[in-house]
Amino acid sequence: LYTSGSTGVPKGCMLEYGNITAFCHWFKRYYGIDSDSRVAAYASFGFDACMMDIYGAITNGAQLHIIPEEIRLDFIGLQRYFEENGITHSFMTTQVGRQFALEMDCKSLRYLSVGGEKLVPCEPPKDYKFINAYGPTEATIFTTVFEVDKYYPNVPIGKALDNVKLYITDKLGHMLPPGACGELMITGWQVSRGYLNKPEKTAEVYTKNLYDDTPGYEVMYHSGDVARFLPDGNIQIIGRKDSQVKIRG
């Protein structure tokens, strides 16, 4: 799956079956996916979140509903489609999902997740749970999630998924205490193999995990995101090391 990553130049990210499997195990547990669930395939097929829509549903026995192109940005049409088809779970890019959550009630929906860019503070919807998700393609879709249950002046990205560990380090690779800002490092079963035909770039941002040699956690990915741990264990993104701006995920 191709991603611009930290350079702005598209790179082929080599995701493995094990990466997706680890994510789908977490997806089932966190969202309560079962045979009664109906998942909306809303994300673009060029966006890694489409793998969540597709594999998260079909590996757990849920129905998958591909959203018609003509209603993707029609909130009234989308709400009608969700309720007529009993859609229980949906993902949208951050600003689209935020606007939907602010404007639309939806009795069938249980979870609306958003991701791809920083979430502007807002009040959560009353009918369904609103999830702020974070994760680079290199670590398979989501790395953290946070339930927005009230108005937060600066919305955290949450805590690590089941098969992921996170560190925040300084420029020398030393782990930092809560409150201190540094680069967010990601390790675990969701970290991908590296970049297709780019061994030098792979070696630069996929390095040996100096803090944990547990099987599945031997490699850590340098996200390029500056973050800090909050006192409650949630993570807050501060910015980018390279000042990169994300547009439409």
Each PLM stretch: what is its role?
Residues T59-Q63, N85-F91, G97-P156, K165:
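Gly/Ser/Thr-rich phosphate-binding loop
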Residues G18, Q95, E117-K118, W189-Q190:
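Alpha-helix/helix-capping structural signal
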Residues L1, I20, I131-N132, E147-R248:
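AMP-dependent adenylate-forming
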Residues K11-A40, D48-T88, F146:
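Conserved AMP-binding/adenylation subdomain of ANL enzymes
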Residues A43-F47, E70, T137, G188:
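Conserved AMP-binding
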Residues D34-D36, A41, M51, E83, ...:
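His-Asp-centered acyl/peptidyl-transfer active-site segments
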Residues L1-G12:
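Conserved adenylation A10 loop of the ANL superfamily
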Residues M14, R38-A40, G46, M52, ...:
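Short, well-ordered beta-strand segments
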